[in-house]
Amino acid sequence: MERAGATTLKGNPLTLVGPELKAGDAAPDFSLVDNGLKPVTLKDTGTQVRIISVVPSLDTPVCDAQTKRFNEEAAKLPDLSIITVSMDLPFAQKRWCNDFQVDKVKMLSDHKDGSFGANYGTLIKELRIESRAIFVVDRDNKVVHAEYVKEVADHPNYESALAAARSAASAKASE
C-alpha cells in the first residue's frame, strides 16, 4: 500500500509505504535492530505502555531535538517505555546517544529491511528513510495514539503523545 503525498519534506510531496494506523488498531509486529545488532520485535519491547518516536535521522536538528525531548520525558515516566526508531545504522545511533548522553530511550534501527516503516506506514518510498511520527502502544499492543507529522521538518505534538501515554498507563493501572 502506498500513500502518495501523505507527507512532505520542505513542501515537496512524498509517498509513504504502508497503512495509516489509527487509535484502536492492533500494533503491527516489526523486526528492528538494537545497537548490539540484536533483532528486536514488538513482543521484545515488553508489556509497558510504549511511546514509539519515529525520526528520519538523528543527525538532523528536529530529530535530534525530538529524541532529546523524549529522553528528558522518560526520566519523569518510569512506568512507560520510550523507543526511538530511525533508519540510522545501529553504530550511528550508539555514537549519537554517547555524544549527547541519551540513555533513557531505547534506540532501534529499521535499516536492515524497513519492516517497521512498511508495517507502521512511515517508510518514505523516494528516500528510504522514516517519516516523522509518534505512536503510543498500550499494554495490550493496541495503538492508542498515532500522529504522522505532515511536514517531515516539523516537530510532532509532544504533549498529545505524552497525554495519551499517561492516560493509557493510568487506565490500565486502575483496572
Language-model segments: which ranges?
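Chalcogenol-based redox active-site neighborhoods
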Residues: 1-175
